[in-house]
Amino acid sequence: MLTNKGKNIMNSQLVDKFFEAMSNSDVDTAMSVLHDDCVNHDMGSGQVMRGIEENRADMENWTNTFSDMKVEPLNHVESGDTVVTEMKMTGVNTGDMEMPDGSKIPATGKRVEMQGCQVAQFQDGKMIKASQYYNMMTMMAQLGLMPE
């Protein structure tokens, strides 16, 4: 049950703003959506980013790895201060991909397309917690880094 429809609409609009900023490699605008204490769980890689600087570094890694990356929200489901978003990400791997252990995989020049889901919680008009769910193996197979 939606307890505050106006607030939820604002929260889903913030998710849209965040994804649009990612799609435009506009890291500053994306960071403006995040709470200073935002914790971001990347379930595909197993990484956890805490605070603005770690989230900024993560987003810069994604936008450098996929210079033409587009993140498209397909559907929002909202309840209270939580927004669940189905999303589609596309991009061409034009830059080295930094892995969680700090190693780098050279660019493949291959295109990826994958769907996933983000669960985001909001506090004080900012994203305080987010978890992205996607299949890392799908992405690695599309990049030619493992058998399909």
Residue ranges and their predicted role:
Residues 2-148:
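C-terminal and inter-domain tail/linker signature
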